[in-house]
Amino acid sequence: MEKFVIRGGKPLRGTVQISGAKNSAVAVLPAALLADSPSVIDNLPDIKDIETLAEIIKRLGGKVEKGKHEIKIDPTGLNSFHPPRELASRMRASYYLIGALLSKFNEAIIPMPGGCNIGVRPIDQHIKGFEALGAETTIEHGFIRIKAEKLRGAHIYFDVVSVGATINLMLAAVKAEGVTILENCAKEPHVVDVANFLNAMGANIKGAGTDTIKITGVDKLEGCHYTIIPDQIEAGTYMVAAAATGGDVYVKGVIPTHLESIIAKLVEMGVIVEEYDDVIRVRREGPLKRVDIKTLPYPGFPTDMQQPFAVLLALADGISVITENIYENRFRYLEELKKMGMKVRVEGRSAIIEGVGKLTGAPVYATDLRGGAAMVIAGLAAEGITEVLDIYHIDRGYEAMEVKLQALGADIIRIRE
């Protein structure tokens, strides 16, 4: 087991380079399995979820050559549609293998997805879509089995906006016979990124980033060289860390338009934000103001950023409210922040946070990936020493977090116990 030990109270200063988008990468790697030749994917984040996916692809018969930020995937030897449970159950995004393997073999057997324990996250919209394409679904003994004689295009309306279902149905429909129309689609940047990757391999996908996506099935895809977009959530995390510590940080290698909702809330709180081509400067010189936050599908405020912002709201003047509209039960991390002096109560989908001005160091657990990031930010801003335990959650989605923070002047070390 490993933990972070943080001595707080030091403003972050300097420049941080943002890695490739986790949420893109975990879908692009399964998408590469659809080609009849190798693909090279770069700007890959060096995180645990990518290591897990690479190992799964090897177990399925694919060849993988992985560097730190680049991977070559050769799917020509793929011979299995049944990823091993011990690997696939580690990460929720393993469900993208369903769409990819269903498209490749007309069959997929996947263990129920793992990842962060943040409440009910059903995959009913995925299953509804697969069945509309002609597949049959059974769930037994902890596995999802999906099988089709032939996949045929269909008109599919998602009952709720779902990033996972939108991407998974693109993967499944890309080689299906005829035309597939997806309506009420997610518009997140990584949805567009996956569509761009598939199109670079020869797919015919139009409308990604809008409510309606049209997919005209093609007979074959060929591998390509592709660069993943920067990680908007990692960028947002460092922007919040700069504000929480009263620092001055240049967040480099970003697409500012992907961060508009995050920037808007920081500015509303009194943080100074300057935008350049691929750099955002974040600095705080005065007190933080209270704000209310409602998580919404993109371009609304991202659910993955409410946890870091909760720390900022604890340091602000007045009472703020976070309303979580995407996932149920995504406030478990707040119990840990209470140990550091946070005043908060949860009422249904809302967390009411009373600003306390300062936090104090304490031993806390990273309850999940983004909750773990919130613990680190709290530790950086707090008086005294904070220990963040169970940091494997953080390593699943943040590349070398302590190394990047050390370069900004943070007093943070990783300890192996």
Curated annotation (Swiss-Prot):
EC numbers for this chain: 2.5.1.7
Binding positions for phosphoenolpyruvate per the UniProt entry: 22-23
Chain residues that bind UDP-N-acetyl-alpha-D-glucosamine: 92, 121-125, 304, 326
Domain of life from the UniProt record: Bacteria
Modified residues (2-(S-cysteinyl)pyruvic acid O-phosphothioketal): 116
HAMAP family: MurA (MF_00111)
Protein known as: UDP-N-acetylglucosamine 1-carboxyvinyltransferase 3
Organism for this UniProt entry: Caldanaerobacter subterraneus subsp. tengcongensis (strain DSM 15242 / JCM 11007 / NBRC 100824 / MB4)
